[in-house]
Amino acid sequence: MNYLEVQNIAKQTIDYIKTVIKPNMNLREIRYLCEEKMLSLGADSFWYWNIGAFIFSGDETTISVSGREYVTADKLISDNDIITIDLSPQCKNVWGDYARTIIIENGTVVNHIENIKKQRMAKWFTNGRSSA
């Protein structure tokens, strides 16, 4: 498997998770679904500390955490949330590295940036997650 094929595993995984992610899903469930999807698409392992999917939401999306210290938070997605997913599939020692940020607004994944309600997101960034 070449680099582009491994990257495609990660891209397909993000495309998949965007169809199933919803409010009240636990970040740990999202990690599990992402890792299972990558394995089903041909990844044989995960190159970064054996973690296939780093999942962050809300204020956690602004921090940097070493894989050595990473623990997926036991946290639920809210109706208005921001989620960062960073994937690290590997196949036959070929690494992929693919990250995306997903916006949930009014319980729905926003697929195009122009569909984000600017006032709501501005409120998010100025007042914090709880008032979004």
Locations of regions flagged by a protein language model:
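Active-site neighborhoods and metal-handling regions in enzymes and metal-associated proteins
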Residues: 1-132
